[in-house]
UniProtKB/Swiss-Prot annotation:
InterPro entries, alphabetized: Ribosomal_uL18_bac-type, Ribosomal_uL18_bac/euk
Record HAMAP family: Ribosomal_uL18_B
Pfam families with a match to the protein in the record: Ribosomal_L18p
Highest taxon in the source lineage: Bacteria
Protein name: Large ribosomal subunit protein uL18
Entries under SUPFAM superfamilies matching the protein: Translational machinery components
Name of the encoding gene: rplR
GO molecular function: 5S rRNA binding; structural constituent of ribosome
Source organism: Polaromonas sp. (strain JS666 / ATCC BAA-500)
Function: This is one of the proteins that bind and probably mediate the attachment of the 5S RNA into the large ribosomal subunit, where it forms part of the central protuberance.
Family label: Belongs to the universal ribosomal protein uL18 family.
Keywords attached to this entry: Ribonucleoprotein, Ribosomal protein, RNA-binding, rRNA-binding
Statement: the UniProt record of this protein carries the keyword RNA-binding: yes
Amino acid sequence: MLTKKEQRLRRSRQTRIRIATQGVARLTVNRTNLHIYASVISGDGTKVLAAASTAEVEVRKEIGASGKGGNVAAAQAIGKRIAEKAKAAGVEKVAFDRAGFAYHGRVKALADAAREAGLQF
């Protein structure tokens, strides 16, 4: 019997295999209790084109005095920031890799904010 974490990692591997066959850049998300991380990785998986996280000093100033990166507002800020960085790197279309996390809460907020900022997926 697989633990919850093993199940999530298994889903993540299967998703990455499917995305790799598409050959487009992927927007990958990692979520911890304190922070949320997002990066855009090239279609062949060898290069990070853009990255953003709530651990960055500029983002912590933007999300408020508390500096908490583990909430929906912080995820929205990261979604907007990663979309801006990806567009600056010349990436318009990505595949969304949620790394096995449920499409709910912070993950959904990040995805919606990235879409609103102009990324297509």
